[in-house]
């Protein structure tokens, strides 16, 4: 049984790190897509007429 003073399992540390990175990337993607600079984004398919 683990107590709060014992070291956590390395697998838990790796899982929390991966989860934090994925959440950060998701947040950055949403901020890029819908944030204040999103008005400057253009769609290259709409800009190119054939």
From Swiss-Prot:
Keyword entries, A-Z: Membrane, Thylakoid, Transmembrane, Transmembrane helix
Pfam families xrefs: PsbN
Annotated GO CC locations: plasma membrane-derived thylakoid membrane
Membrane topology: Single-pass membrane protein
Residues annotated as transmembrane: 14-34
Main subcellular location: membrane
InterPro entries per record: PSII_PsbN
Thylakoid recorded as keyword: yes
HAMAP family assigned: PSII_PsbN
Family: Belongs to the PsbN family.
Function: May play a role in photosystem I and II biogenesis.
NCBIfam families linked to this entry: PRK13183.1
Name by which UniProt lists this protein: Protein PsbN
Organism: Prochlorococcus marinus (strain MIT 9515)
